[in-house]
Amino acid sequence: SLSHGKYYALGSGPARAMATKVKDGAVEPVEELYKELEYRDSHDKTVLVIENDAVPPVEIVEKVAAACGVSPADLTIIVTPTSSLAGGVQVVGRVLEVAMHKAHALHFPLENIVDGTGSAPVCPPHPNFVKA
C-alpha cells in the first residue's frame, strides 16, 4: 500500500516487482513475497496502477521512483478509481494473481504450476466506492 498524509492507495504492476529498500545494509525487495521468491524486475522505466480516485501526491511519486531506481519522469502512474469501469476491470483482472498468492500462502510449490487461467465477473461501475 501507498500512503502519505491522508492519501492511501493500493498499487499493482511492474513497479511492485522493481521496488527495493536497504535493510541492515543489504538491498532487498520492498515486498516480502518477492524476497521469498528471490525475484526482482529491472528496467529503466516502470508502471504502477493505483486504486484511488485521486492523483497521488508528489511525495509518493518520488518515493516509488526512488525505490524502483528510476527517475519520476520514467514512472507512469495510472489512477483507476474502484468506482470506474477501468477500476473494476483492474481489480478482477488480477484473479489469477490472487490465486497464486493463495497457493504460495498454503506453501504449495509454485514451481509445480506451469499454466493458469481465471475468470471473474466485471461489476458495473457504481459512484459509491464501497458498493463498487
From Swiss-Prot:
Reactions catalysed according to its record: 5,10-methenyl-5,6,7,8-tetrahydromethanopterin + H2O = N(5)-formyl-5,6,7,8-tetrahydromethanopterin + H(+)
GO terms (BP aspect): formaldehyde catabolic process; one-carbon metabolic process
Record key words, sorted: Cytoplasm, Hydrolase, One-carbon metabolism
EC identifiers of the protein: 3.5.4.27
Superkingdom of origin: Bacteria
Localisation: Cytoplasm
Keyword Electron transport: no
Record-stated family: Belongs to the MCH family.
Function: Catalyzes the hydrolysis of methenyl-H(4)MPT(+) to 5-formyl-H(4)MPT.
Protein name, UniProt field: Methenyltetrahydromethanopterin cyclohydrolase
